[in-house]
Amino acid sequence: MMATEKISPGMQQYLDIKAQYPDAFLLFRMGDFYELFYEDAVEAAQILELSLTSRNKNAENPIPMAGVPYHAAQQYIDTLVELGHKVAIAEQMEDPKQAVGVVKREVVQVITPGTVTDSSKMGADSNYLVAIDRQGVQFALSYMDVSTGQFFVTSLDDFTSLCGEIRNLRARELVIGYALSEEEEQVFSNQMNLLLSFEDEVTEDVQLIDNSLTDLEKAAAGKLLSYLHRTQMRDLSHLQKVVHYEIKDYLQMDYATKSSLDLLENGRTGKKHGSLYWLLDETKTAMGMRLLRTWIDRPLIDLKRIENRQAVVQVFLDYFFERSDLVEALKGVYDIERLASRVSFGKTMPKDLLQLSQTLGNIPAIKNILQQINEPALGNLVAGLDPIPELHALISSAIDPEAQGTITDGNIIRTGFDETLDQYRLVMREGAGWIAEIEAKEREASGINNLKIDYNKKDGYYFHVTNSNLGNVPDHFFRKATLKNSERYGTEELAKIEGQMLEARDKSANLEYEIFMRIRQEVEKYIGRLQKLARTIATIDVLQAFAVVAEQQHLVCPRFTDQRELTIDRGRHAVVEKVMGKQTYIPNSIHLNTDTHMQLITGPNMSGKSTYMRQLAVIVIMAQMGSYVPADQAELPIFDAIFTRIGAADDLVSGQSTFMVEMMEANKAVRLATDRSLILFDELGRGTATYDGMALAQSIIEYIHDKIGAKTLFATHYHELTDLSQTLEHLENVHVSTLEKDGQVTFLHKIAQGPADKSYGIHVAKIAGMPEELLQRADRILQTLENQAPTAPTHPAPSVVEEPSGQLDLFADTPSHPVLDELEKLDIYNMTPMEVMMAVAELKKKI
């Protein structure tokens, strides 16, 4: 835009508002359209496939312009937000017909990926807005689902933990309360693909932010609230009091672990199907579905809480018919959490209140079912089923069950609720009869057989007279409009009736609106009780879902022990089993204790090593959620964390290879795991040379065995490592058995004691469909190699390095190299594998 160009007052208003929201698409209301200008118009036209036009087309520099109809704007807003953009909505704040000069406009809301509450693309899943603050090396993280008002805060000790928690929350927008470093911005923006927003102001709300929080936690929570108030510009009375949590209070799993175990989505397809969530989701309500995802994300480590959940599941299993009735009743429960939020936002529609009324009407039936069961395990759930009878009575008596559309469409309030409104409606009904009487009377008096009364907004009520009958028009008719083939007439009598009817209609519409707003304000008083009810319903729903799945999948109740024993008899991977359908799943048992806490697993690819490892992790997660588990019998310790390295593609976004990712994930395990953790490593070291890979694999096994003592499953293709069982007393060898007959190999998918004797790689290639000629050539090469002297070590390195003998050193007089001196000082047996790698890398630079 040229500086010398003259800007109209309207465009100047646009530019002034746009300057306040430079990082958002500004939808500028102009009549029946939201218009976009300049760069916003160009970019939005491309994204939304809009026609790009221009304002002042004859000017030297026309202003690019694009627009969307106001009544269809939501779908365009949803698309922009879904793609990670912010959208600022500038509305007309006065009637353009009564405006003096430029119509007053203001931004009434900024919709962002983290604050969206009613997008058609949102679904029932939680949508978290995350805020962070920093003080030294300490971080605080606060997050909220604006659509439900749930509000949380925690502290983290380092940047890695912070990023891990943000990933776990699957956040799309991050509110930052401190000055970011370039490295942090690179991680958040490029690697984690977050929309970054910044907030300096802290909202101090004693109703929401507890004084028991640390100052840093208060700052993070307060900045999140401040950002919300700045962008939403509406009532947020549905926000719940912030809940402080500690990450260590739950079974800890990082994002990579959850992805590799297919907990919330299938890691290969990105879809729900084939995930643990898919298996367990027999919920019937939106609240239950969200809570189930939370429970999968955060299994418990508190035995009492786990056993409380198990007890309810057992009750629901014992009372099949009552559970069936409960399931039917839950189907009539709507999303109370989001309905309550819509009340707070002032966006409640008649259908929302009807859904709320229907839900409250179902609560007594649900409560009665649980009371009939009369089991102590259900006591707290029964107590939490508050039917709020006074609210149900208000809505059911006030809102017409056939009410449709918006609050200005009329016919919302039930007949009999308000006497004055009933009188207005009576006038409108009787007026219709009066008009019919006038029409019949004038038709007979005039002799115009096709005389009729019609209505439109411009002319109101009128007599429609065709040109052929104009000679018969009575003298007391007065002309209202002339058309090509007819004319429209009125009479004083018709005008009087019309006036009464229109007055009654307008007063009726205004009164209905007032009544609806009063009801909405009354409903707002119950938001807290509705949210508590929603939590109870969600818990009941998830636990009945656990019972349904336990029955369908033949699951058993796991027992927990503090003796560090892990025994699973004929365990199964329930997700794989369900996906297989009618095919037979081969179960496997596992026993680990203080004497044997590591298994080294060998066997061919595709034989089931990874499934066996995942099976154990999924059973642990299900058990600590309070669910039953797929086994004939299960006795488990309570784990504090699960660490995995089970397959992954190269991390192309961050520029890290498969091997680097392997080492980073292995390093995380050896640094953070305890003797109460579960470690699952699959083919660790495969991403580098044979010597390097086997050396690292052995060193990591030894470190976990000697220093950590965590329950560990370690699958490897390095057959030489099986000899470690001779020196590591807590390690045992197991393998996936095969049946070889007449040159054909069958994978039995059964875990057996001892190491595998072959890898069967060529057979796997055959299954994959490799050409026969290629396979025959590979077999000949294999036989040749097997007959030659081995080029790789046939045994692992000794667990303890022997001291040198007394033999003379030919180079004894050679001066020592500084690198050798530093190398000699390294205490490698008290270092993690990653620390050894980093030290060697530094020494290489000095050579």
Curated annotation (Swiss-Prot):
Keywords: ATP-binding, DNA damage, DNA repair, DNA-binding, Nucleotide-binding. InterPro entries: DNA_mismatch_repair_MutS, DNA_mismatch_repair_MutS-lik_N, DNA_mismatch_repair_MutS/MSH, DNA_mismatch_repair_MutS_C, DNA_mismatch_repair_MutS_clamp, DNA_mismatch_repair_MutS_core, DNA_mismatch_repair_MutS_N, DNA_mismatch_repair_MutS_sf. GO terms for biological process: mismatch repair. GO terms for molecular function: ATP binding; ATP-dependent DNA damage sensor activity; damaged DNA binding; mismatched DNA binding. Gene3D superfamilies: 1.10.1420.10, DNA repair protein MutS, domain I (3.40.1170.10), MutS, connector domain (3.30.420.110), P-loop containing nucleotide triphosphate hydrolases (3.40.50.300). ATP binds at G603, P604, N605, M606, S607, G608, K609, S610. It holds the Pfam family MutS_II. It comes from the Bacteria. CDD domains: ABC_MutS1. One of its GO terms (cellular component) is cytosol. Belongs to the DNA mismatch repair MutS family. This protein is involved in the repair of mismatches in DNA. It is possible that it carries out the mismatch recognition step. This protein has a weak ATPase activity. This is DNA mismatch repair protein MutS. It comes from Streptococcus suis (strain 98HAH33).
